[in-house]
Amino acid sequence: SCTEKTCPGTETCCTTPQGEEGCCPYKEGVCCLDGIHCCPSGTVCDEDHRRCIQ
């Protein structure tokens, strides 16, 4: 699981499919269900097309 110390303050921590901690390059980013992709705050993951939508 992620802790506040895992990633810099400008990034968001996401748990990978392997259960490890990964960093998303967006502040207050949204982790996608696949655990690989992430989206900027205010958007949602489009899992089918692997993109972020408003």
From Swiss-Prot:
Pfam families: Granulin. InterPro entries: Granulin, Granulin_fam, Granulin_sf. The keyword Manganese does not apply. It comes from the Eukaryota. Keywords: Disulfide bond, Neuropeptide, Secreted. Six disulfide bonds are present. SMART domains: GRAN (SM00277). The keyword Membrane does not apply. Brain. GO terms for biological process: neuropeptide signaling pathway. PANTHER family: GRANULIN, PROGRANULIN. Belongs to the granulin family. This is Pars intercerebralis major peptide D1. It comes from Locusta migratoria. The lineage of its organism: Eukaryota, Metazoa, Ecdysozoa, Arthropoda, Hexapoda.
